[in-house]
Each structure stands twice: as C-alpha cells, then as structure tokens.
Amino acid sequence: DGGVFAEITYGKVPALSRFKFLVIYGDPAPGENKTKKSSTKTVCLLGKLAGRLYLIKTFLDRGLNAEFVEWYIKLLEFVGGKTTVYCYMENNKLQDPFFQQVFQPIVRRIRRERKISLYITGDEEKKTDKATRIEANLEPLNREGNLILNEAEKDNPHMKRMAEQFKLFN
C-alpha cells in the first residue's frame, strides 16, 4: 500500500439533478490493445457538491480507443439529461496529434452514425507532474472525508480498480 490514500471513503451520491453540472474526464493511455503490458485508460464521471467531490462512476481498463470513447457515451447515458455534462480528455502537447488524428475522427464517426451529441474538449492546460497534482488536490479532500466514491459502484470491477489505484499511490 502506498499510504497517501490509506482510507477510501464510499458514500451515497446525491441525485444527479442536484449537481449544477458534472464532468466526464478521460485519460487515454496510448496503445490499441488489451495486453497486460499495455497502459490503462480511464474515464470518470465526477461532480462537486457542498465541498465534496464525488466519483460517481468510472471506467478503468486496458482497451481499444473506440471502447474508450464508448465509455463517454455510457456515462452520458447514465446521466440521462438530469444535469449539464462537460466532457474533457487529457491532451497535452505530446498527446495532441493522437487526440486530433485518432480520437476526434472516432468521436465524429460515432456522432454521425448514432446521431448523438458527443463533444469532447481536449484539456490542454499546462500541468505539473500528475503525482504532485493528485497528492496536492485529492489527498486533502480524501483526508477530510470529502472525496467520495459512489457506494452503489463499490462492487463494479472498474471502481474496484480505481480504489486500488488510490491505495497504491505513494
């Protein structure tokens, strides 16, 4: 165990309609395979209410790029129009060609084929080291019991993997 996130708090998520908005955020590991050596991709549905950050639902697995985009759709369907949702994807300078040449065409194709409104904005904000950001932003919330993982998703393999990622963090 890493120690930074020794305890994980699970709790009931308020009705989605109570959130002013929700964010779907994805981190697309490079690669187009499901082997044990490939990196994991993740897409999370997050909401903040009354000082608490809720991890409402997540997908965390090795997978294909089209599956990664499909996770956004599943999360949008889960919200079901109960509140506004903003969709973002990690997109630093190194990832931008991948975002433009691989993900955007997949999103456009799916939007056209399914006649759905799916728009993912690349998060191009220059950031510090990921580990530093996690420790600085999420650890204090977690320590105070204000980082809440959805108890209804506790047995979901994706949420289990996310909780494990937190516990391994050091």
PLM ranges: what are they?
Residues 7, 31, 106-107:
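Short regulatory "switch" loops immediately downstream of catalytic or recognition motifs
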Residues 24-25, 45, 88:
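Structured core elements
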Residues 26-43:
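An active-site-proximal beta-strand-loop segment
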Residues 49-169:
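Mg2+-dependent endonuclease catalytic cores in nucleic-acid-processing enzymes, primarily RNase H-like
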Residues 13-18, 47-53:
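Flexible internal linker/loop segments at domain or repeat junctions
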Residues 28-32, 59, 170:
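Short, well-ordered turn and helix-capping elements at secondary-structure junctions
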Residues 11-17, 32-37, 74-81:
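Short, conserved, surface-exposed binding loops centered on an aromatic residue
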Residues 1-28:
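ATPase catalytic-site recognition across NTP-hydrolyzing enzymes
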